[in-house]
């Protein structure tokens, strides 16, 4: 059991039939404890401590495996690169503790806005990604628009000191154009930046 969930079964196999004794039971308990500790260590190494989202290391590992499967099975994949707007202003005006709370609030909204099959991660700072697979580019675009609307509703809470919003870039995966996951991220980041610049240049 790990966090109350069954994760597998351990068994002892011998060439000769024999009764299950207390020593065998203790051995199994020790082995199970070792496995659980190892799984916990792996999980902690790939989780962002503040937000409990997958961190950059975890995302890179998972994304590489998923994209390889997508190539082999001709499954479409789309990456959204997300950056919070005016995050520096939140830190400057309200302090870093409030900035951390903003990141946590945003992450909680992210974690519930997408399908369980979508990979949501915090790369670091105020940068996040969502990897969509098995769906169309239009679905990814619609999902991001819907998430923006959800965030706008959350901003209407009377106790809010500031509003959270984001800019994003969407890129369809092509393993010829993006042979490495870093290339895929870089292109999505570039489109996000263009989106952010265009938002700032819009008349208010």
Description of each model-found segment:
Residues 137, 141-148, 152, 158, ...:
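Catalytic-core segments of nucleotide cyclases and related cyclic-nucleotide turnover enzymes
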